[in-house]
Regions:
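Extreme N-terminal tail/first-helix region
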Residues: 1-14
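Short helix-to-loop capping/linker segments positioned immediately adjacent to catalytic or ligand/cofactor-binding
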Residues: 4, 19-24, 101-105
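Short beta-strand segments
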Residues: 12-47
Length: 120
């Protein structure tokens, strides 16, 4: 991985992800924000009771494409690890207070949260 890509991954920004549709097997592209917290890459979202389609797709097939866009453009094969453990979710999402979230426990219960590994 080149230095520009490493630099882009070191700070959160808007990206696209392409997952595989769990029912259709077709590629599904979605704009989303990633975060680098302590050197680890996460994708999360605002709390909602209903699971997002992209998350359900990643639960069915954790392999996806992480598309950097903007100043650095790259299509990176990646693997998602859906984080379900409440204690781990709480630890990661504690940073959300800096994003203006009022209710951490609502985030722990209802926010999508995946850790991303960029594949070699």
């Amino acid at each position: 991985m080149n230095d520009d890509i490493l630099a882009a991954l070191s700070e959160g920004k808007v990206i696209d992800i392409t997952t595989t549709g769990r029912k259709t097997g077709e590629p599904r592209r979605k704009e989303i924000v990633f975060h680098n917290i302590g050197g680890r890459i996460y994708i999360s979202g605002v709390p909602r009771e209903r699971k997002r389609d992209w998350l359900v797709n990643l639960e069915a097939d954790p392999h996806f494409v992480f598309h950097l866009k903007g100043d650095v453009v790259a299509d990176l094969p990646a693997t998602a690890r859906v984080i379900d453990d409440p204690d781990e979710r709480r630890q990661v999402l504690a940073i959300a207070e800096k994003w203006g979230w009022d209710d951490l426990e609502d985030g722990v219960r209802h926010s999508p949260l995946v850790e991303v590994t960029i594949d070699d």
